[in-house]
Design a protein with these regions (language model features):
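Basic helix-turn-helix/winged-helix DNA-binding cores
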Residues: 2-110
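Intrinsically disordered, low-complexity, charge-dense segments enriched in Lys/Arg
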Residues: 108, 112-206
Length: 206
């Protein structure tokens, strides 16, 4: 591993270490206006930005989510704790899934848990999902090192001045293939959900 490659991997691991999810007890229990919502999201998800001037969520985005029924409409222009939890899910999903796919995923969650009066509410869903975070981060770090080593074992006969770039190119190709395959699996699962939903509807109609 060259000094440049070591510096790159240290930078990647430092970025991963900075990532954190919003803890349930950090989410306000009072309703917020739109400006307060965007400020809250901006402050608490800043570590996920690629560039400093990137926006986490804008008013236009949030209005579009409500218009497309990804998000229940606010009550008297105020957004509840449940709205914030839904927006966090949407924020992560929107980078890899289409609006219609997010609708398929979040529709049943909204219907059953959004205004639940039992202990199994949106906070329960959020806590259960994000409780897996630390385990996944540890796995990710080990997996990244394994893939980086694999990428460094190819192009052994390349010109020395090209080898470092080609190793990085191979590493990116490995990661991209992984992302592509996982995205395809997610889309297939969502298609199956849609298909099952359709079958259920047709059976009821019969």
């Amino acid at each position: 591993m060259t000094s440049n490659e070591k510096e790159m991997m240290n930078s990647i691991f430092a970025k991963i270490a900075e990532l954190d999810y919003i803890k349930p007890d950090e989410i306000p229990n009072i309703d917020l206006y739109m400006d307060q919502v965007t400020t809250f999201m901006e402050e608490n998800l800043a570590s996920t930005k690629r560039h400093e001037d990137d926006k986490i969520l804008t008013k236009t985005m949030i209005n579009n989510y409500a218009k497309n029924k990804l998000l229940p409409p606010p009550e008297k222009k105020r957004y509840s704790r449940e709205h914030l939890l839904m927006l966090i899910f949407i924020y992560y999903f929107k980078n890899i899934l289409s609006i219609s796919d997010i609708q398929t995923l979040l529709g049943p969650i909204t219907e059953k848990y959004f205004k639940s009066m039992t202990e199994k509410d949106m906070t329960y869903i959020y806590q259960e999902v994000f409780s897996m975070e630390q385990t996944q981060i540890r796995y990710l770090e080990k997996d990244l090192m394994r893939r980086f080593k694999s990428a460094g074992e190819v192009f052994e006969d390349a010109d020395p001045e090209d080898r470092e770039f080609l190793h990085q190119f191979s590493f990116i190709c490995l990661l991209s293939f992984d992302v592509y395959m996982k995205k395809m699996i997610i889309e297939n699962m969502i298609d199956h959900m849609n298909s099952s939903k359709g079958d259920g509807t047709s059976k009821k109609e019969k």
